[in-house]
Amino acid sequence: MKETDSLTCSDLRPARKAPQTAIGQVLIEALPYIRKFERKTFVIKYGGSAMKDLCLKNSFAQNVTLLRKVGINVVLVHGGGDAITKTAEKLGITSTFVHGKRVTDKEMISVVQMTLAGKVNQDIVQLISEHGGKAVGVTGLDADTIQAVPCRDAATLGLVGEIESINTAYIDLLCKAGLIPVIAPIGFDDDGNIYNINADDAASSIAIALKAEKLIYVSDVAGIQVGERILKTICKAEAADFIEQGIITGGMIPKVLSGFLTLDGGVRKIHIIDGKSVHSLLLEIFTHEGVGTQFISEQDDESNH
C-alpha cells in the first residue's frame, strides 16, 4: 500500500477493473467471517495518520460502515492529541508533556473537551454519515459512560484520569439500534471533575466491559515487527521476551502490555493494523491472511481470527 504522503483519493478506487473471478473470490473468502462475526462487538481505537489524511479518513469511514452493514456492532474510541495541541496554540495555551502524557489543568481540560467532543468527534460522525453509516457522537460524560479517578501522577499531570468503571448501558442501546457509537475519551468523577483519558486505555476498558469479540488498534505501524517481518500472531510469553531483548520498544510497549491485559479481561482477540494502508481494517477482518498482528492467548493458536 502507498504511504500517506503519496496517497490520493483515486487510490480508494481500483486503477483498472479487476477480473470478475477475483472479485468473486474476495467475496467468498469474506463470507465465513461475515457469518462468524454477525452480532459480535468490535471496539476500534482510531488514531494516528488515519485521522489526518482525507483519503485515509474516507477509507476508514467506508470500512466501518461496511462492518456495521454486515451485522457487526462497531464501537469507535478516538484520540485527537494533535488536534488538541493545535487548538491550544490558537488560544495561546502552551502544551506540556511529561513522559508522553499531556499536563492538563482546568484551562487545558476545557480545550480537550472542546476539541475532542466538539470538533474531532463530530467530524468522524459526519464522515461516517457521508458514506451511508449511522453514527452517534458520545463522550464519557454521556449517561455516566466513563467514570474516572485522578491518575497516580495527578500532582504533576493535573486532570489526567484513570478509568474506574464503564457504564455500558448507553453503548448497548446505541448498538442495538443499529448505530455506531463514536466515543471521545473524557471521563468524570463523583465530584463532577472532568478528566482527560488516554484513548488506548479507554478502548481497552470499554472492550472488556462490553465483552467484545475484538479490540482493534488502528495505528501508524503495520503490526509488531521483528527484523523485516511483521508478526501475524504474538502470545504473552513471546511479547515478554521481545520486550526484554529490546525488539519491542518505546510507545509500543504500553500498547502491547495493555493488549494482553485486555485479553486477560475476556476480549477474544486484539489486533494492531496500519491505518496508513487503505482498507486495512477490512483486509484484517475478512481475509485468511490478515494484514496486521493479533495477540493470542495460546502460542499454538495460529488462526487468523
Curated annotation (Swiss-Prot):
Enzyme class: transferase
Keyword Transmembrane helix among UniProt keywords: no
A GO cellular component annotation in the UniProt record: cytoplasm
SUPFAM superfamilies: Carbamate kinase-like
ATP-binding found in the keyword field: yes
Subcellular location: Cytoplasm
Residue numbers marked as site, Transition state stabilizer: 45, 255
Name of the molecule in the record: Acetylglutamate kinase
Protein's organism: Chlorobium luteolum (strain DSM 273 / BCRC 81028 / 2530) (Pelodictyon luteolum)
